[in-house]
């Protein structure tokens, strides 16, 4: 089913860190009725994430960092456990994950497998995130990780079974991370 959409107005409300826009559009429904909508859209750019895993050790590498949006939404300390990720800026997705993995986790990504790409919150956020998995070993450790500039990132290497248990307990609550962990489990990669 294809809908006819006509842009009426695109007004920038804020360009502080990302871009918040107010979009007015007419949507012609399949019965021919034209309905006008006004929505705010948050454009933060597209991103990429990678879950590092080690079959031999049956472990994964995750990070823990402060996320202000979770804190505003009731996460008491604002800390979130998640897969390594970053915004694409002008990079290709695989270039992005390689750069972010070194910066955040300290591990070099050798061979990466793209799993899928998903919209994070399509009701109001433009972001499309490219999700990867990549195997790591001790030899691929380049530095201690921890992020750059103003980032404060803790690197967490943990058993895969513990990561899955943290999902069940509600300790890991980041959508991309849950999807990537479940992807490893569904494919039997860590068996």
Curated annotation (Swiss-Prot):
Pfam families with a match to the protein in the record: NUDIX (PF00293)
Keyword presence, Magnesium: yes
Enzyme Commission identifier(s): 3.6.1.-
Enzyme class: hydrolase
A molecular function GO annotation: metal ion binding
Stored CDD domains: NUDIX_GDPMK (cd24157)
Nudix hydrolase domain span: 43-180
UniProt domain comment: In the dimer, the N-terminal domains are swapped between the two monomers, such that residues of both chains contribute to the active site.
Subunit structure: Homodimer.
PANTHER family (alphabetical): NUDIX HYDROLASE DOMAIN-CONTAINING PROTEIN, UDP/ADP-SUGAR PYROPHOSPHATASE
UniProt protein name: GDP-mannose pyrophosphatase
Organism (species): Cronobacter sakazakii (strain ATCC BAA-894)
Gene: nudK
């Amino acid at each position: 089913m294809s809908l006819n959409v006509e842009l009426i107005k695109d007004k920038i409300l804020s360009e502080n860190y990302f871009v918040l826009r107010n979009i007015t559009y007419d949507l012609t429904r399949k019965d021919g009725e034209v309905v006008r909508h006004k929505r705010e859209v948050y454009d933060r750019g597209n991103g990429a994430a990678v879950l590092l895993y080690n079959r031999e050790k049956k472990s994964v590498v995750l990070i823990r960092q402060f996320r202000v949006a979770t804190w505003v939404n009731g996460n008491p300390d604002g800390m979130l456990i998640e897969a390594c990720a970053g915004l694409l800026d002008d990079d290709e997705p695989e270039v992005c994950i390689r750069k972010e993995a070194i910066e955040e986790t300290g591990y070099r990504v050798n061979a990466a497998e793209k799993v899928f790409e998903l919209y994070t919150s399509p009701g109001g956020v433009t972001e499309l995130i490219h999700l990867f998995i990549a195997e790591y070993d001790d030899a691929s450790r380049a530095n201690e990780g921890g992020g750059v500039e103003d980032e404060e990132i803790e690197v967490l290497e943990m058993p895969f079974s513990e990561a899955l248990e943290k999902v069940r307990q509600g300790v890991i609550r980041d959508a991309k991370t849950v999807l990537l962990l479940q992807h490893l489990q569904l494919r039997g990669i860590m068996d």
